[in-house]
Amino acid sequence: MPNIPTIPLASWIDKLVDGLTQFEGFFNVITNIIGGIVDAFQWVFDLVPPWLFIILLVFGTFWVNRKGKKWGLIIFEVVGLLLIWNLDFWRDMTQTLTLVLTSSLIALVIGVPLGIWMAKSNIVESIFKPVLDFMQTMPAFVYLIPAVAFFGIGMVPGVVASVIFAMPPTVRMTNLGIRQVSTELVEAADSFGSTPWQKLWKVQLPMAKSTMMAGINQSIMLALSMVVIASMIGAMGLGTRVYFAVGRNDAGGGFVAGIAIVIVAIILDRLTQAFNKKAKSE
């Protein structure tokens, strides 16, 4: 705009990031915690041979979905995972699962309590709603910049960026699920002298479980959508295969890695949906 000074917003943000990087000890603690979770998941995946992993997944699917249509999913799991194994993508797939599961676990641990807090206070909800809107609408690439500044490169900054991008659905659906619990049920719990914690654990959370699971499903899918972006800052996995294929203009390699990501996405999505149906039936 002519004759109007430019607001130095970018400079302010740079100074804020530079100031936060001075808290190196704090970020080292977070790095060690997240790194420990990542190493634990990867150790388990490396310990289990591919054939045993497939068998365990089939049994898990059968148990979760024993009352529903399960054979189509089981056949897809077996064929899809055998294809990934045959293409020599197994290690990449387990690294991708490590990133997704770690991000989803952290998003769940932070998001559910935050959603409960929002459900209990309209003021808190009014404060965090625009924050969640900001987190979901900001391009995911932008999160890589502060993640690298605070945590360096590797799996940890990839997990942090994925958590920020994937957490809002869990928070929103937890808040929504608790608020949708029938007031008659809440009043009945009050009439029996339930404490706020008893009311939360025995009435509100069980009734909101289905809605919360829908949010968790969305968070898992969003975390999986970050695998290619996270590969740009050193997070290993199938996303790295896609990223390298783009750099080499390798259409075949990129599509094959993309198909592997799609297989993982479908399996995770169908499993969480089956778990949600099982929770509803109970």
Curated annotation (Swiss-Prot):
GO terms for molecular function: amine transmembrane transporter activity; amino-acid betaine transmembrane transporter activity; carnitine transmembrane transporter activity. InterPro entries: MetI-like, MetI-like_sf. Its main location: membrane. Residues 93-272 form the ABC transmembrane type-1 domain. The keyword Transcription regulation does not apply. One of its GO terms (cellular component) is ATP-binding cassette (ABC) transporter complex. One of its GO terms (biological process) is carnitine transport. The chain crosses the membrane at residues 44-64, 70-90, 99-119, 140-160, 220-240, 251-271. It is a multi-pass membrane protein. Keywords: Amino-acid transport, Cell membrane, Membrane, Stress response, Transmembrane, Transmembrane helix, Transport. The complex is activated by an osmotic gradient or by low temperature. It is found in: Cell membrane. The complex is composed of two ATP-binding proteins (GbuA), two transmembrane proteins (GbuB) and a solute-binding protein (GbuC). Belongs to the binding-protein-dependent transport system permease family. This is Glycine betaine/carnitine transport permease protein GbuB. It comes from Listeria monocytogenes serotype 1/2a (strain 10403S). The lineage of its organism: Bacteria, Bacillati, Bacillota, Bacilli, Bacillales. The gene is gbuB.
